[in-house]
């Protein structure tokens, strides 16, 4: 929800997640708390597509993948449903001095999501946050140009929208995508990911209609990569190659 928080009153701030029941999350109990359960992102996407396809009224869904790692996953889900894949371009806002971690996210329409609890712990100044946000917005714009070539997102009004990524760590990147999709009036929003921490899956599930996650893990230390036997970070060239293969 939009809240007033000093200098950041126009941003969407989410408090720390509190673990609750796992309602609204469809998982594979055989994969619960296990590691290295998928060969790679394509394998994970194929398995996920089989499960997503069992949901009611998913025919004709809009499938949106979050680059980079979500593209091969979303590609397989779209193939299972006979849908066309589109992109939900969202980037985490990197913590100064620690580019592997983030304290929020920026989506394609300029929406900004701040992890307020982490921001307070880090003790970041307003100037630090503004600099990081502007850098992230620039990166999002560059990716829009590189990956979409000006193609508009499909109409989502009255349709089921499936948001796909290769996993949920904090969940804030996905939450930013959800916030940008919701005003487009989809009939429902489904988040489909191969793996997630239990807390992030619960956080996201409270804000969408359904979370489909094959591999939910409850350990305090969580890494998306630990679900995959073959893991590496996709670069922009590989994303373009995936999209070219699909003639997007």
Model-derived regions: residue spans:
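PRPP-associated nucleotide enzymes
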Residues: 1-248
């Amino acid at each position: 929800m939009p809240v007033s928080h000093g200098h950041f009153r126009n941003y969407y701030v989410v408090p720390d997640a509190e673990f609750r029941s796992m309602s609204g999350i469809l998982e594979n109990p055989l994969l619960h708390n296990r590691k290295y359960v998928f060969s790679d992102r394509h394998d994970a996407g194929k398995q996920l597509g089989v499960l997503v396809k069992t949901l009611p009224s998913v025919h004709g869904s809009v499938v949106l993948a979050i680059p980079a790692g979500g593209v091969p996953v979303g590609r397989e889900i779209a193939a299972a449903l006979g849908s066309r894949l589109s992109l939900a371009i969202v980037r985490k806002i990197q913590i100064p001095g620690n580019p592997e971690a983030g304290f929020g996210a920026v989506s394609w329409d300029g929406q900004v999501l701040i992890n307020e609890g982490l921001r307070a712990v880090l003790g970041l100044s307003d100037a630090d946050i503004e600099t990081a946000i502007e850098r992230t917005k620039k990166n999002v714009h560059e990716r829009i140009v590189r990956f979409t070539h000006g193609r508009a997102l499909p109409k989502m009004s009255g349709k089921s929208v499936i948001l796909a990524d290769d996993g949920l760590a904090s969940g804030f990147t996905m939450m930013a995508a959800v916030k940008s999709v919701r005003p487009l009036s989809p009939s429902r929003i489904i988040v489909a990911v191969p793996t997630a921490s239990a807390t992030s899956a619960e956080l996201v599930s409270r804000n969408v209609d359904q979370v489909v996650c094959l591999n939910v893990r409850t350990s305090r230390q969580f890494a998306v990569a630990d679900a995959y036997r073959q893991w590496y970070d996709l670069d922009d060239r590989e994303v373009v190659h995936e999209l070219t293969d699909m003639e997007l």
